[in-house]
Amino acid sequence: IEQRIYDGMEGRTFYRPKTISPINCTNVLIEGITMERSTLWNVVPIYCENVIIRGITVNSTKVPSGDGIDIESCKNVLIEYCTLNCGDDCFTLKAGRAEDGLRVGKPTENVVIRYSLAQHGHGGITCGSETAGVIKNLYVHDCVFDGTRTGIRFKTRRNRGGGSDNTYYERLRMINVGKAFTWDLLGSAYYMGELAARYPARKVNRLTPDVKNILIKDFIVESADQFFTANGIPEIPFNQVVVENGEIKCKKLIGALNDAAGFTMRKLTIEAQHNDIHILDGKDILFEDIHFKLPAGEIMVNVEGERSGNIVFKNINANQEKVEYKKESPMRIEIK
């Protein structure tokens, strides 16, 4: 709690106020308003139940940390027909941070985000990095991300706790985004210190995040710098991820698929300028029914890590496949 005192006293930063923030409320309706040049986050329900946010517009592109909508530890939330143009993340879901979040013990659950537009912003839909209470049962559909730094973004850290379960995304369109899909459980050394180092694997405890059961389907990425990147943690890898039925145009393919178990990409058409796929300690990985349009028609797959295994490429159209292994990686990849 002491870390969250921003009263401007004794050299501390002054805490900028949120624009609209109902706390511990039931049956909340926020509809048809426009917010311009806010001081911080715009719409922030906290510990609420039965929330509808409909048809709002946010313009806060030059506001540091100018999030659009932040849902924190709420239950039964519907967000629809919103247009967000933000200085930070557009649509954000949080569930408490570290020990304080575990003490409160309130998840963010049963959330639907639909028929909405995210324009300028760090992330179109962002989960985290506060995830202690767990973000679960999230359904995002029929949304457009135009010019955001990332499309779908998940971030948490080793000491944040919780994680996510049952997050579903479908019928999405992305235009001029940086990274289309990104998951990051490590963070940077600047903020996390030695916890940002992937190894050594830490002992699993109550603050170890667990991210599982992710479905992404029926989407179009018209233009992106990178299609997909995922940096997990070795102590609890990503588990059960499916990405299917998509059309992608990007510069880079998969920058990192690290510490993942049960990961499937299938029924995709991918046009990319670079042909690299990097896998580190990935197990039970399947790429199936994928039509690649790549330089020289070949895929460069770089596999590392002693735990990498059962990596299968099936029914892909690339003319030839190149696979590179580090010395510690046994050859556990199959191309059919």
Question: Could you say what each language-model-derived stretch is?
Answer:
Residues 1-336:
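Extracellular/periplasmic carbohydrate-active domains that bind, remodel
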